[in-house]
C-alpha cells in the first residue's frame, strides 16, 4: 500500500518516455524505487508531455497510462476562481494553466509532494499555510 501521495508533472513523463531526455535515466531509476508512492496528476499534464514526445514516446506513455499507475483528477468550473487566483498570485513566474491547476488542486487535496523537473517554479509555489512542495525527484 502506498505510503506517500505525489503529483506527477510534465517533466517526469517526458523524461520517462523520451530516451534522449537528459533526465531519462534518473526518471527510470526514480520510478523503479517509487512503489510506495501513489501518483496523482491531471490530463493537462499528459497533453503537455505528448507535445514534447515523438510518436514512439507518445505510444509508450499511453500504454503505460493504460496500466493505471496514476490517479487523474478532473478540473471543474468550480475550480476556476481558485486557479485564476493562483495565476494572479504567481504572475511574476508566468505560470501556465497546467501549473496553476496543479498547485490549486494540491492545496485543495492536501497532496504536497511532486515529481517534476521544474525546480524554479515548484520551489517558489506555496501551498496553503505557506509550505513548499516536497520534491521527490531531482
Regions inferred by a protein language model and the residue ranges of each:
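Conserved glycosyltransferase catalytic-site signature
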Residues: 10, 43, 99-100
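Conserved short hydrophobic patches within well-ordered secondary structure
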Residues: 101-102, 114
Amino acid at each position: 500500500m502506498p505510503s506517500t501521495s505525489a503529483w506527477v508533472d510534465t517533466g517526469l513523463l517526458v523524461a520517462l518516455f523520451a530516451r534522449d531526455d537528459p533526465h531519462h535515466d534518473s526518471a527510470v531509476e526514480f520510478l523503479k524505487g517509487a512503489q510506495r508512492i501513489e501518483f496523482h496528476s491531471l490530463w493537462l499534464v499528459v497533453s503537455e508531455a505528448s507535445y514534447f514526445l515523438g510518436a514512439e514516446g507518445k505510444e509508450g506513455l499511453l500504454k503505460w497510462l493504460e496500466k493505471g499507475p496514476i490517479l487523474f483528477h478532473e478540473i471543474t468550473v468550480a475550480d476556476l476562481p481558485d486557479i485564476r487566483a493562483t495565476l494572479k498570485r504567481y504572475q511574476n513566474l508566468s505560470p501556465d494553466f497546467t501549473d496553476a491547476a496543479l498547485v490549486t488542486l494540491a492545496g485543495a487535496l492536501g497532496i504536497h509532494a511532486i515529481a517534476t523537473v521544474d525546480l524554479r517554479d515548484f520551489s517558489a509555489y506555496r501551498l496553503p499555510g505557506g509550505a513548499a512542495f516536497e520534491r521527490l525527484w531531482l
